[in-house]
Swiss-Prot record:
Belongs to the universal ribosomal protein uS8 family. This is Small ribosomal subunit protein uS8. PROSITE patterns: RIBOSOMAL_S8 (PS00053). Part of the 30S ribosomal subunit. Contacts proteins S5 and S12. One of its GO terms (cellular component) is ribosome. GO terms for biological process: translation. It comes from Pseudomonas fluorescens (strain SBW25). Signal peptide: none annotated. One of the primary rRNA binding proteins, it binds directly to 16S rRNA central domain where it helps coordinate assembly of the platform of the 30S subunit. SUPFAM superfamilies: Ribosomal protein S8 (SSF56047). Keywords: Ribonucleoprotein, Ribosomal protein, RNA-binding, rRNA-binding. Gene3D superfamilies: 3.30.1370.30, 3.30.1490.10. The gene is rpsH. InterPro entries: Ribosomal_uS8, Ribosomal_uS8_CS, Ribosomal_uS8_sf.
Amino acid sequence: MSMQDPLADMLTRIRNAQMAEKSVVSMPSSKLKVAVAKVLKDEGYIAGYQISSETKPLLSIELKYFEGRSVIEEVKRVSRPGLRQYKSAEDLPKVRGGLGVSIVSTNKGVMTDRAARAAGVGGEVLCTVF
């Protein structure tokens, strides 16, 4: 059976691993997942990520905790296969008054809402992280 929404699967695996207090979570890799993992690392939400390819490419994400609590409080898929969400640079959502980030897929690559606003580009709002 094929996976309908690989990015939602990635976010669910991260959410479930953090609830189970795991240190590392693995999943099938793709260019989009690696780009989202890079943004999460740059923003300080995960400790790191690694791509290994024995037979199939595998993405391993090292989760981050602070004082026993997960750094990621909430991760939510915004644009989904049944209802895509495209926003212009001015209309990009601020997550919790700017405390969280929206991850946006633009024609200049995957970036945060702040970076997209600064570059003056809009795109598909993939997910929000707080």
